[in-house]
C-alpha cells in the first residue's frame, strides 16, 4: 500500500535528486541563478533554510523531485552541495514500473520532451544536470511574470501554456528574439482562445 507521510525535512545532496520531468526552461534557471547570486551569505542561508524541494521517496529510497526543478538546477549550477527536501510520500516499497505509474497518475510526473511529445519513463533524466532545455517553458514563465496569466495550482500549468505557445509561435522567432516572442505570447495569452488554460486572466481590456 502506498504510504503517505506527514511532510518531514531532511538535507539531501543536490546531485542525488531525481527529476520527474524531462525539460526545464534554461532562461528560468538563469533568472533563479541571478536571484541566488544577489543574496548575501546570510540571506542565502536563510533562503535555503526556508525553500524546501518537495520529493517523493522511490525505489531504493531515492528522492524524486515533484516541483522546483528550476531551483534545483540553479542550485546545482551555483555549486550548492545540499538542500533541504520535504518528503511528501514514501513509495519506496514499489518497484520501478509501479512507482512510475503512480507518479504519472498522481500528476507528479511530466514525461514530455522539448517538442511537447510524450516519452517513455526511461527518458526522464537521472539527475538535475541532465535536464533538457525547452525554450517554450521559459516563454511561459516570462509571460506569467509579465501578468499574462495568474499563478495556478494545476500540476505543470506552465507546461500547458508552453504547449499553447509552441503551436502558435515559431521556434525561429523565439530563438532570434526572446523579448519579441514574449510580447507576442502576452497578446495570445489574453485572447479567448487561451481561456481553457489554468490561470487565464481574461482578455486585455
Where are these regions (language model features)?
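Surface-exposed, charge/polar-rich loops and edge strands
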Residues: 3-46, 50-62, 76-205
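Short hydrophobic beta-strand that contains or immediately precedes a catalytic carboxylate
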Residues: 64-67
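Active-site-adjacent structural elements in enzyme catalytic domains
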Residues: 70
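Cys/His-coordinated zinc-finger cores
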Residues: 73
Amino acid at each position: 500500500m502506498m504510504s503517505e507521510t506527514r511532510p518531514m525535512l531532511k538535507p539531501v545532496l543536490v546531485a542525488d535528486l531525481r527529476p520527474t520531468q524531462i525539460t526545464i526552461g534554461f532562461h528560468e534557471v538563469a533568472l533563479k541563478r541571478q536571484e541566488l547570486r544577489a543574496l548575501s551569505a546570510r540571506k542565502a542561508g536563510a533562503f535555503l533554510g526556508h525553500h524546501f524541494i518537495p520529493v517523493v521517496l522511490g525505489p531504493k529510497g531515492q528522492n524524486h523531485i515533484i516541483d522546483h526543478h528550476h531551483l534545483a538546477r540553479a542550485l546545482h549550477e551555483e555549486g550548492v552541495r545540499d538542500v533541504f527536501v520535504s518528503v511528501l510520500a514514501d513509495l519506496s516499497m514499489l518497484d520501478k514500473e509501479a512507482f512510475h505509474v503512480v507518479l504519472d497518475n498522481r500528476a507528479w510526473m511530466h514525461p514530455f520532451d522539448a517538442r511537447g511529445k510524450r516519452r517513455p519513463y526511461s527518458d526522464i533524466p537521472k539527475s538535475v544536470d541532465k535536464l533538457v532545455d525547452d525554450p517554450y517553458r521559459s516563454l511561459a514563465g516570462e509571460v506569467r511574470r509579465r501578468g499574462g496569466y495568474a499563478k495556478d495550482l494545476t500540476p505543470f500549468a506552465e507546461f500547458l501554456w508552453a504547449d499553447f505557445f509552441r503551436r502558435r509561435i515559431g521556434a525561429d522567432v523565439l530563438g532570434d528574439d526572446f523579448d519579441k516572442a514574449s510580447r507576442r505570447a502576452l497578446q495570445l495569452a489574453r485572447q479567448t482562445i487561451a481561456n481553457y488554460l489554468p490561470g487565464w486572466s481574461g482578455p486585455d481590456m
